[in-house]
Regions:
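An N-terminal RHG(E/S)-centered segment typical of histidine phosphatases
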Residues: 1-48, 64, 68, 72, ...
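Glycine-rich phosphate-binding loop signature in dinucleotide/nucleotide-binding domains
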Residues: 45-47, 136-148
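Short glycine/proline- and acidic residue-enriched helix-loop micro-motifs
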Residues: 105-124
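Phosphate-coordination/substrate-recognition cap region in phosphate-metabolizing enzymes
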Residues: 37-109
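Short, well-ordered beta-to-alpha junction loops that form the rim of enzyme active sites
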Residues: 54-56, 84, 147-156
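Acidic, low-complexity terminal tails and accessory targeting/binding regions
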Residues: 2, 88-99, 142-145, 163-244
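Beta-strand elements within well-structured catalytic alpha/beta cores of enzymes
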Residues: 3-7, 144-153
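Short active-site segment of divalent metal-dependent hydrolases/proteases
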Residues: 12, 157-158
Length: 244
């Protein structure tokens, strides 16, 4: 059995300003840097055998700060930057305020499968997620030793991942899942999954949720998006879609 930590990046400038900024501009805020270091300290005794990050600077920086707090030593090139775990492109809502995007999402009935004009489709997102999962599966299945894998990615991308794992029952058995887990995680919160090796070519692969929305490391449970929802009654219907 191997372990995978799926982590949402720390708070970014865009999160703090409630703006959907271009990836190259959307760096971690001071709060985000602190969150990443706090998570690193929380996981300081975990030795990661493999480390993956989205190519966006807010994810790479989060990964670097997590590893900087570890008691283990890592090579400078330990982080594998993987474009398959980047955030979903939202088409005409790129560069718009989060409030505008949230209202548009509400108008769909809070449908996570919503495809805005010009956006990356759900099918396109799931295709790259499957490519990433196959690479992770190859790592898990190679050799006899347990792997411990860190994956730093994004809130919406993680929602798509959980939906995909739940729906593709011919490929994955997603154990210990609860419906209330299907919410956008706060910044630097994590899911810990236990993953079984495949026996030969047999499918499906078993994955079990060990920790959902892990937040023990956070000094405060306040979150930029939660504040936006709390301060705008017009966004009340989103309270069930985000971790409180």
């Amino acid at each position: 059995m191997s372990l995978i930590y799926f982590v949402r990046h720390g708070e970014s400038i865009g999160n703090n300003q409630h703006e959907n900024l271009p990836p190259e501009e959307n760096m971690l805020s001071e709060t985000g840097l602190f969150q990443a270091k706090q998570l690193g300290a929380h996981l300081e005794n975990v030795v990661f055998t493999h480390v993956f990050s989205s190519p966006y600077i807010r994810a790479i920086s989060t990964t670097q700060h997590i590893l900087s707090e570890s008691k283990a030593s890592y090579r400078d090139d330990v982080i594998v930057v993987d474009s398959d775990i980047r955030e979903r492109h939202m088409g005409i809502y790129e560069g718009k305020s989060i409030k505008v995007l949230a209202h548009a999402f509400i108008s769909t009935g809070a449908d996570f499968g919503w495809n805005p004009e010009g956006a990356e489709t759900r099918q396109e997102v799931e295709s790259r997620l499957e490519s990433f999962l196959r690479r992770i599966g190859n790592i898990v299945d190679t050799g006899s030793e347990q792997k411990t894998i860190l994956v730093v990615t994004h809130g919406a991308l993680m929602i798509h991942l959980w939906c995909y794992l739940l729906e593709r029952k011919e490929k994955y058995i997603f154990k210990n899942w609860k419906p209330e887990y299907l919410k956008v995680s706060k910044n630097t919160n994590y899911f810990l999954l236990a993953v079984e090796k495949l026996k030969g070519t047999a499918q499906p692969r078993e994955l079990e949720v060990m920790v959902a929305h892990g937040s023990e490391h956070l000094v405060t449970q306040k979150d930029a998006f939660n504040r936006l929802v709390k301060d705008n009654k017009s966004l009340d219907s989103l309270k069930n879609c985000v971790q409180q």
